[in-house]
């Protein structure tokens, strides 16, 4: 349960996000700008959050404009959300402790794109609150209510689109068994805050479930979903308005490789495919580079549109190309560059 899974072929083993100076800078900003105290009003805390998010977003846009990679920028935004949720969680625990002598073990996991550490400027945030057994009764309901009020409400009030689920470990695995989309999202699960033992218990049981729950059937089902998705998006890379996320050769195709690898071999990452001779080292590096470039295109789309956009529409292409550093005067040459 290192903060970031070693997905990328070019990443050194078990790289910690804190090793990047940009991510350390974000954490320093949080220490200065986020000071949630019980004496503060809800409005004052909300203003702190809004100002913190505004300043960090402006900083990310500057890094993007100077040419930072798509992957580094999406990881940086994930760190921003991490530190915000960690601060909100600490405050929520203070509120809980006023009414409960002993806080029951629970944790918050990032799932989906947030779990991978790949949040573009306007990407949705997916969270899973893992709670102890429901036999806690009223104490559990109080704990859940406090976490919703002190964590989710502030995120929603600042305009973030946050998806969430509150589950026990067994419930989470049952949901993964019912729906492949839930399973894929949980394959990217990452610890954010709370009791690490609860998180480790979930990861251990979930990966054990994935390895025992007919892996071949999962691969077939995922391949079927991929074919359907590609058909909906034109089933070709030669489109005037490509979908960088769901189109053929888009972000979702790469992510599917990681999910399949994790289920088949028990661990994700292109390194496993290289060691198993499914890919050459050069092919793995090329995939990584292409993926990071698509993330950079998506980041530019989000910054320019000020909303989550994945389709590179024809009228947007000249300005997106310019924002990515392609400065040819002829707009057709610029787009094709």
Regions found by a protein language model. Give the residues of each.
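A nucleotide- and high-energy phosphate-metabolite-utilizing enzyme signature
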Residues: 2-337
């Amino acid at each position: 349960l290192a903060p970031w899974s070693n997905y990328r072929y070019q990443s050194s083993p078990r790289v910690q996000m804190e090793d990047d100076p940009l991510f350390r800078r974000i954490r320093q900003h949080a220490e200065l700008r986020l000071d949630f105290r019980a004496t503060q009003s809800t409005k004052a805390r909300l203003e702190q959050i809004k100002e913190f998010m505004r300043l960090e977003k402006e900083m990310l846009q500057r890094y993007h404009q100077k040419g930072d990679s798509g992957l580094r920028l999406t990881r940086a935004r994930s760190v921003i959300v991490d530190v915000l949720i960690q601060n909100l969680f600490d405050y929520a625990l203070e509120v809980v402790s006023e009414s409960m002598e002993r806080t029951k073990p629970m944790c918050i996991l990032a799932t989906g794109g947030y779990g991978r550490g790949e949040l573009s400027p306007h990407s949705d945030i997916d969270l899973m609150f893992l709670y102890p057994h429901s036999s806690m009764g009223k104490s559990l309901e109080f704990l859940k209510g406090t976490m919703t009020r002190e964590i989710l409400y502030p995120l929603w009030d600042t305009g973030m689109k946050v998806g969430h689920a509150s589950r026990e470990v067994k419930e989470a695995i049952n949901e993964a068994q019912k729906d492949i989309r839930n399973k894929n999202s949980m394959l990217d699960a990452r610890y954010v805050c709370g009791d690490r033992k609860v998180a480790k218990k979930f990861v251990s049981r979930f990966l054990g479930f994935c390895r025992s729950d007919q892996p071949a059937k999962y691969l077939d089902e995922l391949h079927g979903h991929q074919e359907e998705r590609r058909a909906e998006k034109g089933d070709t890379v030669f489109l005037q308005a490509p979908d960088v996320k769901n189109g053929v050769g888009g972000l979702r195709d790469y992510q599917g490789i990681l999910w399949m690898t994790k289920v088949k071999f028990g661990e994700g990452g292109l390194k496993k495919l290289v060691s198993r001779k499914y890919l050459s080292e050069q092919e793995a590096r090329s995939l990584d580079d292409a993926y990071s470039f698509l993330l950079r295109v998506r980041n530019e789309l989000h910054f320019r549109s000020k909303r989550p956009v994945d389709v590179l529409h024809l009228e947007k292409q000249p300005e997106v190309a310019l924002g990515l550093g392609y400065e040819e005067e002829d707009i057709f040459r610029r787009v094709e560059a």
